[in-house]
Each structure stands twice: as structure tokens, then as C-alpha cells.
């Protein structure tokens, strides 16, 4: 049976996008409650994402299960900026860069574990769960490429979209696969538009909604056997 191509559409509101993103940012800066910000954002995203075939997405993860790892990740991502304190202005950029590079293998390890947990907590109804099979070495390699591309200013969208295609290609479920169709050029153009609108301050909630819509709209779900999905629920243990 040929695979069924299913598009995704994000229908969340602009002010809700602003509120959830702001909550996520605040809780991440506070480090310890970072998991509650992430879970709240993911649950809201899943509840507001519609699939072309009428299926429903839900996020069933609990922040209390993974709060420590989310806190560790938030701390690791803030650490390079903290390292610049007390350093002379002409050396701050170098200190941040060195700290970022040194911490990258550990950041990759924590992120990959969290990504696997997040994918396992997403449910498709009718259907079930999935798992992320991406390897640590592969993900670390992509993270190095994306991090290095940030310093080129214009190449990071191409690196980021390539990494997202690689990650989505490693999502496995019962009769289901995921692909990401966004391009680097498309993301670069959208980013310039988002930045231009954000300068005006007022459109920021709509900019955030557009960001969620763009990334969600470039996800595709492929079902190889629709009838089997209606009968089988995949149990994923992390």
C-alpha cells in the first residue's frame, strides 16, 4: 500500500504564542523550572496542530519526569554567558566561544536524550507513539555544523534545515515516518521578514505565531498502512 502524505497546520493564536513563548523563556532563565516551560509549550503546540486527515496530536509528557535534565540543559546554555563576567571586554567573545565549544559534547548528549523523550511523548490519535533513533555521534556532528554556521551569518538556515531533515528522518513509529521539507533559502527569507517586523515591537506576537506556523507547515507525516494504525497503539518506553 502506498504511503499516505499528511500535512500539518498550526492554528494557535498570536497572543497565545507570545504568552507561551514568554513563559518558556522566563522559566528557562530560572533554570530549575525549565521543564515546566518546555512541557507547557509542547502541549499547547500539539493541541493547536491540525493534521490533514483529521487525526489529532497530543503531548503526554510530564515535566516532573525530566525536570532535572531540562534544568541541566538550561544551565549549560547559560554557562557561556556567565563565564564572560569579570573578563575584560576585548576577551569576552573569545571566552564565550571557547566555553561554547568545550560544552558542546555535553550539550549534545543532554539534548539528544531530551529529544528522544519528547518524541516518545507525542501521541497520534488514531495511532500511537514513535521514537527517535538518531545517534549521538551523528547529532553531535550536526550540532557542530550548526554552531559553526552561526558565525557565517547567512549559512545557519541551511545548516539548521539540513539538521532538521536528518532528525525527522530518524523518527520511527508503527507505519509512520516524518519528513521536514523546509529549505535554507526559505528560512533565511522568513527570518529577514521576522526580524524586520520585530523591530516594530507591536507585531512580535504575530511574528511568533508565524514562526510556529512555518516550522509546523513544513512537517509531513507519512502513513504506510492507515488501517493498521487504527488497530495498533505503539507503546514506547524511555
State what each model feature region is:
Residues 1-22, 37-72, 112-142, 161-190, ...:
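Membrane-interface extramembranous regions at the lipid-water interface
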Amino acid at each position: 500500500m502506498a504511503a499516505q502524505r499528511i500535512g500539518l497546520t498550526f492554528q494557535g493564536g498570536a497572543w497565545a504564542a507570545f504568552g507561551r513563548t514568554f513563559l518558556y523563556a522566563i522559566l528557562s532563565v530560572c533554570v530549575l523550572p525549565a521543564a515546566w516551560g518546555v512541557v507547557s509549550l509542547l502541549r499547547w503546540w500539539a493541541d493547536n496542530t491540525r493534521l490533514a486527515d483529521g487525526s489529532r496530536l497530543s503531548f503526554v509528557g510530564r515535566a516532573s519526569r525530566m525536570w532535572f535534565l531540562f534544568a541541566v540543559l538550561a544551565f549549560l546554555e547559560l554557562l557561556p554567558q556567565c563565564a564572560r563576567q569579570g573578563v575584560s571586554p576585548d576577551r569576552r567573545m573569545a571566552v564565550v566561544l571557547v566555553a561554547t565549544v568545550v560544552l558542546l559534547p555535553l550539550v549534545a548528549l543532554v539534548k539528544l536524550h531530551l529529544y528522544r523523550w519528547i518524541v516518545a511523548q507525542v501521541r497520534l490519535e488514531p495511532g500511537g507513539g514513535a521514537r527517535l533513533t538518531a545517534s549521538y555521534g551523528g547529532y553531535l556532528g550536526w550540532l557542530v555544523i550548526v554552531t559553526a554556521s552561526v558565525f557565517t551569518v547567512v549559512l545557519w538556515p541551511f545548516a539548521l534545515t539540513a539538521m532538521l531533515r536528518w532528525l525527522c528522518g530518524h523518527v520511527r513509529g508503527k507505519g509512520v515516518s516524518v519528513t521536514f521539507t523546509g529549505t535554507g533559502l526559505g528560512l533565511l527569507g522568513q527570518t529577514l521578514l521576522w526580524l524586520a517586523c520585530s523591530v516594530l515591537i507591536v507585531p512580535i506576537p504575530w511574528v511568533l505565531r508565524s514562526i510556529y506556523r512555518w516550522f509546523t507547515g513544513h512537517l509531513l507525516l507519512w502513513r504506510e498502512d492507515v488501517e493498521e494504525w487504527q488497530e495498533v497503539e505503539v507503546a514506547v518506553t524511555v
